[in-house]
């Protein structure tokens, strides 16, 4: 339990003890503690006096006064109490309790903010999963940034997380990839008789693959068409996936598992789920096609599994894949999908219900569109290539840290304008620079302290920390673990970037109001330990969203 929860629990226990002591109720109802909207009304407030009115048969203000008169303020860490309005009780805490967070942060280091106990739940988080047919773009970048941050947050909150990328290496798009490579392969050999398929891939990367294969494996030209296309499918996917993996690694995004769609066919899992759905009576034949009765489970219409030409829809392997996720022992399945996949939510949930799996175990987040902006105008195409701007170009333009931070700053269900000019600014108007500068500034002070012979230690006397800005800063440090738990519960990575901005702002305010290194040695030691706790917190929070914490800037 974090320090904030400990203090709240103690306050609730002491209020309950006070009610008993005052003889207000034999059975005490739930005591709710809330943080007042206006900090002038205290650190915490409760309406328990009004709740007790019918039980105690007294005026709520009288009840409130009785609670106040019988409260052990020392045990409750309370220095002042006000009764407001019809009977609200406002508590102002003795903030010395907050200083306990300093040694805790220093001792835990990189693990500060992480919960100590496992939730005992396995989470499979699938994100990015771009088709291996070209470069990653800004939409994939947002998916990667949010997905990786969410994996870090859930891990810190005590979940057992598997990060997975689903490789769409089967289906028509891979056939089109193979046909496109075939055309470029023969062109490189001087044979222009192979035309590009209607839905082919015309990128420079396909030309490069064709040239490379013509140079290294000219013997492929003598293969049968079937064997040749099989080879081009395999080599094309390998080439594109190697490039995608390299870009994602540079973007500081890593996966535990790369799951191949082809493996579902090879292991017979698609036929297995199809047979199971038929056996359970959830499929039917109509218009020469095989349908799944997803309307039985709140979908707006039934879905085709096998088309009238005998080919599978994308939905069938998707069902097999999600059933495989369940079979692997995952309690929670989280999918991060692009904006064009909104219609998938109900049908995928319905498909799980056909197997008796609670569809609430599947959570789908839709990543809304991102617009790249420069000088107030949308940038749609790369100036260098004339094509859509790639993840690699974004990294080259603004850097990994800025890209990761900006793409995690907003809720994924909201549209977002990525200001590339702001992301490159080295000023405090740039959110990531502002946060990183706070860390670098702390490192500079700690370096000066060390030069003066003042070492960071968790065993200081912290009673000298009384400045209002210092207390507010410590409150923010103490709020780190609750913020992680909240971000994990709501699957909201942007709660961490919001926290980082607030923490950096509180530090800058403290820095401007209070000198850390002074002639008062005991106070200096306490402040040095405090800002080390802030530094650890800031570094851990930045790491959670995949951003570095530089020691100098």
Curated annotation (Swiss-Prot):
PROSITE patterns on file: AA_TRNA_LIGASE_I (PS00178)
Localization in the cell: Cytoplasm
Keyword annotations from UniProtKB, A to Z: Aminoacyl-tRNA synthetase, ATP-binding, Cytoplasm, Ligase, Nucleotide-binding, Protein biosynthesis
Signal peptide (UniProt feature, chain positions): none
Example GO molecular function: ATP binding
Top-level EC class: ligase
Pfam families associated with the record: Arg_tRNA_synt_N (PF03485), DALR_1 (PF05746), tRNA-synt_1d (PF00750)
One Gene Ontology term, aspect cellular component: cytoplasm
Domain of life: Bacteria
Alphabetical list of SUPFAM superfamilies matching this protein: Anticodon-binding domain of a subclass of class I aminoacyl-tRNA synthetases (SSF47323), Arginyl-tRNA synthetase (ArgRS), N-terminal 'additional' domain (SSF55190), Nucleotidylyl transferase (SSF52374)
InterPro entries: aa-tRNA-synth_I_CS, Arg-tRNA-ligase, Arg-tRNA-synth_N, Arg-tRNA-synth_N_sf, ArgRS_core, DALR_anticod-bd, Rossmann-like_a/b/a_fold, tRNAsynth_Ia_anticodon-bd
A biological process term (GO) from this entry: arginyl-tRNA aminoacylation
Reaction catalyzed: tRNA(Arg) + L-arginine + ATP = L-arginyl-tRNA(Arg) + AMP + diphosphate
Enzyme Commission designation: 6.1.1.19
Residue ranges of the motif 'HIGH' region: 130-140
Family, per entry: Belongs to the class-I aminoacyl-tRNA synthetase family.
NCBIfam families on file: argS
Quaternary structure and partners: Monomer.
Protein name, as recorded: Arginine--tRNA ligase
Record gene name: argS
């Amino acid at each position: 339990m974090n320090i904030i929860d400990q203090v709240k629990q103690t306050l609730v226990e002491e209020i309950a003890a006070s009610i008993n002591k005052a003889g207000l109720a034999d059975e005490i109802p739930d005591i709710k503690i809330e943080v007042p909207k206006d900090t002038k009304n205290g650190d915490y407030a409760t309406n328990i006096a009004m709740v007790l009115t019918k039980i105690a048969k007294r005026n709520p203000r009288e009840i409130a006064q009785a609670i106040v008169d019988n409260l052990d303020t020392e045990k409750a860490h309370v220095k002042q109490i006000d009764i407001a309005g019809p009977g609200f009780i406002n508590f102002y805490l003795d903030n010395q309790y907050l200083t306990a967070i300093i040694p805790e942060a220093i001792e835990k280091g990189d693990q500060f903010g992480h919960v100590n106990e496992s939730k005992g739940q396995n989470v499979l988080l699938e994100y990015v999963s771009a088709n291996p047919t070209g470069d990653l773009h800004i939409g994939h970048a947002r998916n990667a940034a949010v997905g990786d941050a969410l994996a870090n947050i859930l891990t810190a909150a005590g979940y057992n997380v598997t990060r997975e990328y689903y490789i769409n290496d089967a289906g028509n798009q891979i056939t089109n990839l193979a046909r496109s490579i075939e055309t470029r392969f023969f062109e490189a050999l001087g044979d222009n008789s192979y035309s590009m398929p209607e839905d082919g891939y015309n990128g420079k990367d396909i030309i490069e693959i064709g040239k490379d294969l013509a140079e290294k494996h000219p013997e492929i030209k003598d293969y049968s068409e079937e064997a040749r296309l099989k080879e081009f499918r395999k080599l094309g996917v390998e080439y594109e996936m190697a490039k995608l993996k390299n870009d994602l690694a540079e973007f500081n995004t890593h996966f535990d598992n790369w799951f191949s769609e082809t493996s579902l066919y090879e292991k017979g899992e698609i036929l297995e789920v199809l047979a199971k759905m038929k056996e359970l009576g959830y499929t039917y034949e109509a218009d020469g096609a095989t349908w799944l009765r997803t309307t039985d489970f709140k979908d707006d219409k039934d879905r085709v599994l096998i088309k009238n030409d005998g080919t599978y829809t994308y939905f069938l392997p998707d069902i097999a894949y999600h059933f495989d996720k369940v079979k692997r022992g995952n309690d929670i399945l989280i999918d991060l999908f692009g904006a064009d996949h909104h219609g998938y939510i109900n049908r995928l949930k319905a498909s799980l219900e056909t197997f008796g799996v609670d569809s609430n175990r599947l959570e789908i987040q839709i990543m809304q569109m991102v617009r790249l902006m420069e000088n107030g105008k949308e940038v749609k195409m790369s100036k260098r290539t004339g094509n859509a701007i790639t993840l690699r170009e974004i990294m080259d333009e603004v850097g990994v840290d800025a890209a990761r931070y900006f793409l995690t700053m907003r809720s994924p269900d909201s549209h977002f304008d990525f200001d590339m000019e702001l992301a490159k600014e080295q000023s405090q108007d740039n959110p990531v620079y502002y946060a990183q500068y706070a860390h670098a500034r702390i490192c500079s002070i700690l370096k000066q302290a060390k030069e003066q012979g003042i070492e960071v230690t968790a065993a200081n006397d912290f009673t000298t920390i009384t400045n209002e800005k210092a207390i507010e800063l410590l409150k923010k440090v103490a709020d780190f673990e609750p913020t992680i738990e909240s971000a994990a519960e709501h699957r909201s990575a942007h709660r961490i970037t919001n926290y980082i901005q607030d923490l950096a702002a509180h530090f800058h305010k403290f820095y401007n109001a209070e000198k850390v290194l002074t002639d008062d040695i005991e106070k200096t030691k306490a402040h040095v330990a405090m800002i080390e706790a802030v530094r650890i917190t800031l570094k851990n929070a930045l790491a959670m969203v995949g951003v570095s914490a530089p020691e100098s800037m």
